[in-house]
């Protein structure tokens, strides 16, 4: 018997729909209807403070990802961070902070989430595309 996962749903959720390389400062977007699901840093990398990491959040269901801009939410604050409510709720956590250009992601690290746009300020990376 062979055991393993042979699911396109799992594959599509983990970057098997392609990847894109960036070593400049131009914003990049995934194909229509897709998102970036992981970013591997090839050099120390920073993201633009304004729209550097635009997360595909679904805060109604507790799905929030690190990013630079958040236009949600239940506490009435427009641009706060993922999981940064005054106190934890059934769907939202507390204590998260917004990523800005002062946050350096070191070479070799991979971050996971769902982003609709990536705008680097410095460094180089590979972004993986998923559903």
Specify the residue positions occupied by each region the protein language model found.
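Intrinsically disordered, low-complexity, compositionally biased regions/tails
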Residues: 8, 17-22, 28, 37, ...
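Solvent-exposed, flexible loop/coil segments flanking beta-strands in beta-rich domains
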Residues: 2-49
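Surface-exposed intrinsically disordered loops and tails
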Residues: 54-98
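Beta-sandwich interaction modules
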Residues: 13-31, 91-116, 125-130
């Amino acid at each position: 018997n062979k055991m393993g996962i042979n699911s396109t749903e799992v594959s599509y959720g983990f970057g098997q729909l392609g990847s894109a390389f960036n070593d400049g400062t131009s914003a990049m977007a995934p194909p229509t209807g897709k998102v970036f699901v992981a970013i591997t840093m090839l050099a120390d990398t920073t993201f633009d403070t304004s729209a550097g990491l635009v997360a595909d959040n679904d805060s109604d269901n507790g799905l929030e990802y690190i990013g630079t801009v958040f236009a949600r939410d239940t506490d009435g604050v427009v641009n706060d961070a993922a999981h940064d409510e005054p106190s934890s709720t059934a769907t939202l956590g507390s204590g998260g902070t917004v990523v800005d250009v002062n946050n350096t992601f070191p070479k070799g690290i991979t971050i996971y989430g769902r982003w609709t746009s990536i705008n680097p300020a410095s460094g180089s990376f590979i972004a993986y595309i998923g559903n």
